[in-house]
Amino acid sequence: MTSLTLALDAMGGDHGPHVTVPAALRALKSHSSLKIILVGDKTEIDVYLHQAEQELLSRIQVIHTDEVVSMSDRPVHALRTRKNSSMRLSIELVRDGRAAACVSAGNTGALMAMAKVLLKTLPGVDRPALVSCLPSVTQKPVYLLDLGANISCDSETLFQFAVMGSVLCEAVDKKSRPKVALLNVGTEEIKGNDQVQQAAQILQNTEQVNYTGFIEGDEIYSGNVDVIVCDGFVGNITLKTSEGIAKLLVHQLKRGLTQGFFVRFLAKLIAPRIQAVLSQMNPDHYNGASLIGLRGIVVKSHGNADEAAYLQAISLAVTEAQRRLPEMIKDRLESILLDINN
């Protein structure tokens, strides 16, 4: 298999190298053709590399910088002043062709701003979108976009999101003609604001997108569709609400299973099944949001991700790079525009 190089913002997130470096080593063990460039403070990074296997170390490069984008940095400020930060240098490695993708758990706004300026959008894409997957009752992932990169969107932007989300689902899950829906306040054709209504009309006339109509919030986790499209304001609130509900359910379940001797006894008997259910409800199980629509691959990890969750984000970046996601999106958009013009 052809070797693949990823750039990791080793300093990003709440835990920095304490999480990013061990996760990188685990990724290297899982992917024999993978190489990783760790960008950050070499002294801090080396603490977690000194006991690593020599074969793994041979596939790691460290680029030193002691500048970091803080979680409190405003996007414009970070873009103008953090020019030697671990985040920016990681993205520049993708821009310069030295890495196929980059992963960061750092400041989301700064990451999106830097990625858009440094990598540029694909032809036919007005704005990049942030997309991640959610669990469903059918146990297949459901992709939701936009998650906050664009607070307000016109109909053309929503249409582009639908195309990009469809291609992402095809690339990552190898699913043929994934079902795409627009998130709305009702399923009737008359429901929704002008932007959603107009986007629906465009999608209905686009054969290359398997558009199924509107979907309401209570159907997000049904598994009836594969891709759900909305603006970033709605998407971000939906995602954060989902994560909050998941944490509440996990808390309530754990609390309920510790009350009373008989309940605790039963809990021990079914512990493996309970653990499996809790794992499916854990947001970290789906860690990794992709910033799609750019000329390069950028994956955003949760800032508080642990080692296993960060590994999920790395694995997602590997998959997208192997499938050449930006090229797939570019080709699909060109094909659709050609159909429209003909």
UniProtKB/Swiss-Prot annotation:
The Gene Ontology biological process annotation of the record reads: fatty acid biosynthetic process; phospholipid biosynthetic process
Any transmembrane segments, and where? Answer: none
Q: Where in the cell is it found?
A: Cytoplasm
Question: What keywords are annotated for this sequence in UniProt?
Answer: Cytoplasm, Lipid biosynthesis, Lipid metabolism, Phospholipid biosynthesis, Phospholipid metabolism, Transferase
Q: What is its main location?
A: cytoplasm
Q: What is its EC number?
A: 2.3.1.274
What molecular function terms (GO) are annotated for this protein? Answer: phosphate:acyl-[acyl carrier protein] acyltransferase activity
A GO cellular component annotation here is: cytoplasm
Q: In which pathway does it act?
A: Lipid metabolism; phospholipid metabolism
Q: Which reaction does this enzyme catalyse, per its entry?
A: a fatty acyl-[ACP] + phosphate = an acyl phosphate + holo-[ACP]
Q: Which Gene3D superfamilies does the record associate with it?
A: Isopropylmalate Dehydrogenase
Q: Which NCBIfam families match?
A: plsX
What protein family does this chain belong to? Belongs to the PlsX family.
Summary of subunit composition and partner proteins:
Homodimer. Probably interacts with PlsY.
HAMAP family referenced in this protein's UniProt entry, alphabetically: PlsX
User: Function, please?
Assistant: Catalyzes the reversible formation of acyl-phosphate (acyl-PO(4)) from acyl-[acyl-carrier-protein] (acyl-ACP). This enzyme utilizes acyl-ACP as fatty acyl donor, but not acyl-CoA.
Protein's name according to its UniProt entry: Phosphate acyltransferase
- Organism lineage string: Bacteria, Pseudomonadati, Pseudomonadota, Gammaproteobacteria, Alteromonadales
